[in-house]
Amino acid sequence: MASATDTVSAGSTPRDKVVTRFAPSPTGFLHIGGARTALFNWLYARHHGGTYLLRIEDTDRARSTDAAIDAIFDGLEWLGLGGDEPAVFQFARSDRHAEVAHKLLEAGHAYRCYLTQEELAARRELAQAERRPFRIDSEWRDATPDQWPADQSYVVRMKAPREGETTIVDKVQGSITVQNSELDDFIILRSDGTPTYMLAVVVDDHDMGVTHVIRGDDHINNAFRQLVIIRGMHAIEGGWPDPVYAHIPLIHGADGAKLSKRHGALGVDAYRDEMGLLPEAVFNYLLRLGWGHGDEEIISREQAVAWFDIGDVNKGASRFDLKKLLNLNGHYIREADDARLAALVAPRLATLAPGFAPDKGLDLLTRAMPVLKVRAADINELAAGSVFLFAQRPLAMAEKAASLLTDDARAILTKVAGVLEAENVWTTGVLEATVKQMAEELGIGLGKIAQPLRASLTGQTTSPGIFDVLALLGKDESLSRIRDQAA
């Protein structure tokens, strides 16, 4: 049991090696806040040459699903945040958790509590009526075995200290003090003998060798209760040092409200599959949510590992800004390898462009990337922008594009087809020079040719540079599309 006045200081317990952990509950997909927690744990371990572990807290059997577990692992791997060792599954360790509970019980740090649900409800109502906090004050706390009733179910509660105070010097939040009188005798074993979350977390962290507990600041209150267990076990057998705590602030929406889907907060899988974001962009954006290095906005993984320290994380809540994330993704799209982008775009073209065949179209898609990615903010935009390359003739015309194809414009296209037919060198530069010369000879502006030409080649009013489009489509396909729309 913890002593009356205790302080656990960040860094007060010497360890040979930093060990962090990310411990999600598989009751839903990996959300953006969880991904950032994983990132900070991964970075802190990497920065200190330590180990980063994963634990699946699947004790809520009714809500835990295999699909959620798979999505968590998939999302972490996509972000490059897979664990250094095989993941630990909490439910499988229930016997170990119960073993620790019985040690605490036998040593007098915990006790059997026979209070019924009706008794607890009555005491809770009385506390509400008297407008005071409800605290468990069980008459069973100091009962002896001969006083235990036969054939009556019980829970096992920790004996929380009642006098003095406990202070945690948190790596992020600083010094936090709680009066021990505010701690209640919380349950560690339910009446059916199953361990509670509060106990399981402590036992797993100890057995996994976790030295630094980095998690959301909604767990601050849990830390004081978990220390009661830790110090109880340390008093019994030693070797249960206090962890270093770092409670990071939650993420809010741009309006300061609790983060939700309306702010663009989705599961990590949705950022990849639905929004078409790159993992390096999400990694970089999450890194900058509550932490920074000067004015640096673009930070590589290597730089992040070198610069990151958990003590530099802001205390205040960060605000999620979807627009900034998309802008950052656009930067990484432009920096990305063309073949990689083409491979990411290809699956989306199965529905967008029926004429796309991966075995034949991937090379063209790769060659088109340098001009396509200049305008795109995500993989979806890249896919949409590349559809014209694989469109089937005759092209379906967007309404605005069709409006450009007047009789005069179609007559110009006929002349363009004739001039280009004679061109033997089919490159962007040569094609541009040829069309510009034609415009001069006709005494018209380049736009008078370029606009209907774009419509005939793409079916749209916007596209990459028109001469890039001609070069990518090739001579035969370009001339066929132009003649489809010519007078």
Swiss-Prot record:
A motif ('HIGH' region) lies at residues 24-34. Keywords: Aminoacyl-tRNA synthetase, ATP-binding, Cytoplasm, Ligase, Nucleotide-binding, Protein biosynthesis. ATP binds at K261. Its EC number is 6.1.1.17. One of its GO terms (molecular function) is tRNA binding. Coiled coil: none annotated. Monomer. Belongs to the class-I aminoacyl-tRNA synthetase family. Glutamate--tRNA ligase type 1 subfamily. This is Glutamate--tRNA ligase 2. It comes from Novosphingobium aromaticivorans (strain ATCC 700278 / DSM 12444 / CCUG 56034 / CIP 105152 / NBRC 16084 / F199).
